[in-house]
A protein has these predicted regions:
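Short beta-strand segments
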Residues: 77-78, 138-139, 197-199
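Short coil/turn connectors at secondary-structure junctions
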Residues: 12-14, 71-74, 131-133, 178, ...
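N-terminal small/polar loop signature for handling phosphorylated ligands or for N-terminal nucleophile
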Residues: 101, 107-138, 143-157
Length: 222
């Protein structure tokens, strides 16, 4: 658990890459039923197979050297009640993925959530603490509607504020439209993960994403 996510291990010919540390236990988890306590949240370590083969009990595991200059890792969360119910196509999320990929990021996860603070906070914590991604971009839920809870949920899980990015985005938006001042998006840090709220409009996403995926900014959160 002291090793970072993306650490790689060899067991004979098999190569594994750590993908997540800790995982929420389900109420009916078999381990919990058998032992009365689940180890998943505090001891669970998960990996994906990079090179397959056969392993046996007692095989020695070797920690492999880290990659040289690995890509930064990102996750994208779309907040939309209608989108989460399949009633509206998510156009902003795929656009963000496209822009991140073009900028050299490895997008580990994408998801669509309803505008629910509890669900958003849980995913932000999991992605930052368990998956240890460098960057989480949210899109949607930054306006004045009572259901727009993205900034509040983001601040609730933050360790530190990083206001300059959100301020730069609002400044840039104001140069295009006076409505730019209506965005309540925030930018914060949880551990080593940067979390940035983007508006839900694909047009605004395209205009604003360039600010924080530029080289000077992105290299600051390695």
């Amino acid at each position: 658990r002291n090793l970072p996510v993306t650490s790689r291990f060899a067991i004979g010919d098999v190569v594994l890459e750590m993908t997540q540390i800790g995982k929420e236990c389900h109420n009916d988890c078999v381990i919990k039923q058998q032992t009365g306590e689940c180890i998943m949240p505090h001891e669970g370590v998960f990996a994906r197979v990079l090179h397959g083969g056969t392993i046996h009990v007692g095989d020695e595991m070797t920690l492999l050297p880290p990659e040289e200059d690995p890509p930064l890792r990102a996750a994208v969360i779309t907040l939309s009640d209608k989108g989460s119910r399949g009633e509206r196509e998510d156009k902003s999320g795929p656009l963000i993925v496209e822009m991140l990929t073009a900028a050299g990021y490895k997008v580990e996860e994408t998801m669509i959530l309803p505008d629910e603070a509890k669900a958003l906070k849980a995913q932000l914590i999991r992605l930052a603490d368990g998956r240890q991604v460098n960057l989480i971009l949210t899109t949607g839920g930054t306006g004045f509607s009572p259901r727009d809870i993205t900034p509040e949920a983001t601040c609730a899980v933050a360790d530190r504020n990083a206001p300059g990015i959100a301020e730069a985005m609002r400044y840039h938006s104001l140069s295009i439209t006076p409505r730019g001042m209506l965005s309540r998006g925030v930018s914060v840090l949880r551990g080593k993960t940067l979390i940035v709220n983007l508006p839900g409009s694909p047009k605004a996403v395209q205009e604003l994403s360039l600010i924080h995926i530029s080289e000077p900014t992105r290299r600051s959160y390695i």
